[in-house]
Amino acid sequence: MNIKITSGHLKNARVRAVISFSFKEDRKLSPEIEDLDRILDGAISQLKREQKFDGSDGKILVVPTFGKGKMDYVILIGAGSRRKADLDKVRRLGNISVKTTKKLKIDRFLIDAEPLSVIKEGEDSIAQAVVEGVILGNYRFDKYLSKKDEYRIKELQIRVKRRFKNKAEQSVKVGKILAESQNFTRDIVNEPGNVITPEKLAQIAQDLAREYGFEVKIYDEEEIEKMGMNAYLAVAKGSANPPRFIHIIYRPEKPKKKIALIGKGLTFDSGGLNIKPGDYMRWMKADKSGACAVLGIFKAIGQLKPDVEVHGIIAAAENMPDGRSYRPDDIIKAKNGVTIEIGNTDAEGRLTLADALCYASELKPDAIIDMATLTGACVVALGEYTAGVMGNDERLIDQILDISKRTGEWMWPLPFNDMLREHIKAPHADVYNIGTTRYGGAITAGLFLEKFVDKKIPWVHIDIAGPAHNTKGWYYHPKGATGFPVRTITTFLLNQE
């Protein structure tokens, strides 16, 4: 897709469709649309009245030009209330735009971002959000369908005020990379467990390393055992597909900081001997979403090149029932010497993360961020669309939460309540891998992970169990993997000083 930034008049646009936006508070057409209305002999005003187009959120007015203009269609999309408009509303409008052009089979179109300048953001940020919404909204995973979606965008033009043009050109490049990297993550998550095994996940990391010049280390079962990662190995024992520990490194010339990113990498989770019921096992291919997000972030930073050293760490495994599987009541020693009593083999992700957090702590980074589809309890607490954020450093938590508000990847803080620490105490080991209460499960999981992080290192845990994958589709996320939280964490890395 070719993307151009323009500041010319809409009436001169040489595309198949011009798309503009109208808020509910707008009493009349914008001057640019009024110009087009005159050229079309009042057709826009007439259809606006006839179809009672009032700028309501998501309402669409399609006006054919019948050869009277340089384009085939003028399209108005309702933006709802100005008071509620933000950058994520812009992404949603980008999504509605591309869904509309797809229905009309339009492959060259212009989106007028100027009416959106009432949002308290620069038009460069607005242009970036438009591009993200278009690319994310146009995503589909049709690799295994006999009949594929043939729609492709050849050219997207975005119109901004002339003074924002240079900045918008740069921000649009960033938005394109972020959205395409998020789609890359979606692609891997959407692949089934018979395609993406731990070895295949390691191969993808190696492919990224070759493409962007990263360092990469892949450790096999024997090497993992030598490193003392017994919690991680316990989870992997029941599978015919061997585990792979992945360490991928982006190292700029003069890094300002060192950041470690950890992604939960269960390529499939059956629950192990505490096997999941059939309905709960469905979609467990998405239990690798955190790992895939780390790989997507590396795809982005390989192009955007932030001034921070970044370590991506993935303990890739498959949790399956077998004669070799770990059992309830087993006691396992993690890499840092902490002993873990197994209460349930379906609480396996925190075991793989435990050893990954120990490994990351030994690197002495300035911060550790882990991303994991960890608990159903987080989905119960916050719903399907919001991630839970917790950790040992309020400043780091606040930084990530602030960025998530701009990226539209919704997150909410969860408190480390000292009373809940009592519920991960085990009778015969240092810690239980499940809480002894049915309440606060997302937090007790976070408190478990805390035991494997060096207390001197700022650390944040993001439970993405809700928003990482969806079964219905919402806004610019089609059914399936969302690629959460690639844009938030990449933006965090770009903003480090």
Curated annotation (Swiss-Prot):
InterPro entries: Leucine_aapep/pepB, Macro_dom-like, Peptidase_M17_C, Peptidase_M17_leu_NH2_pept, Peptidase_M17_N. Binds 2 manganese ions per subunit. It is found in: Cytoplasm. The keyword Manganese applies. Transmembrane segments: none annotated. GO terms for cellular component: cytoplasm. It holds the Pfam family Peptidase_M17. Belongs to the peptidase M17 family. This is Probable cytosol aminopeptidase. It comes from Persephonella marina (strain DSM 14350 / EX-H1).
